[in-house]
Amino acid sequence: PLVDGEAVYVQPGAGVIKLDKATGETIWRSMDEDGGMMGGAFSSPIRAKLAGQEHLLVQSRSALCGLVPETGEVLWSKKVKTFRGMNILTPVPYGDTVFTSAYGGRGHLFGVESSDGAVSASEKWTTRAQAYMSTPVLIDGHAYVYLRSKRLCCVDLASGDVKWTSSSIADEYWSMVANGDRFLALTESGELCLLRANTEEFDLIDQIEVADSETWAHLAIDGDQILIRELDGLSAFTWR
């Protein structure tokens, strides 16, 4: 879910709803789906301003959509091909574009435009770089994507070209957070990695073991504090 001011946005068993944070009252419901095997979303909604219009970006099991946060009106919707609807990562806005990728599909960059009060989206390019569960970080016009193949790659957002792909990494999942030209990656096996956003090569600066059990929860950052939740505990570290 996404907490934004006095609202909570949730993608439940079918569609997306906006709730009052204080009371739990449903403010609106949108994008109702059939439910069942293809209902409900793995992804999380995110707020962004694209082409001058405030958006709630929502990735369902079959499509990436832009909604009006106040009303739930669907501004645009673009199909995203997946295997069994596994759209898991959170879409990432960059300028007036949105990057996403899906299991069993491809990576996509969609551009958002506004003309005569109407907002629309179109696909700018696709790439074979296929993410799985890990939401990419976007730094200086490049996406750093942890792939289904357990490799990290760098994608040029202007062209969709893959600049490099790392050798195989043991972990299935990374959660990543950017800070300037560096980013942190927490592996599901409890390793915290510090990497430089290098468009020429995989650039690992340092890594340490921070957990004794699996760490599937996303990294949480509060100022210079890094919060890491493992199966049976919570740890805090300082990021300098």
Language-model segments: what does each one mean?
Residues P1-G72:
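Internal metal/ion-chelating core segments
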Residues I17, C65-G66, H108, C153, ...:
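WD40 beta-propeller blade core
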Residues G107, G190-E191, D212-R240:
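Blade-level signature of beta-propeller repeat domains, shared across WD40, Kelch, NHL, RCC1
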Residues R106-G107, T127-A197:
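Loop/turn-rich, solvent-exposed surfaces of beta-rich toroidal or solenoidal domains
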Residues D20-G24, V68-G72, V112-D116, D156-S159, ...:
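Short loop/turn segments that connect beta-strands within beta-propeller blades
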Residues L2-D4, R29-Q53, S77-Y94, S101-Y103, ...:
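Extracytoplasmic beta-rich repeat domains
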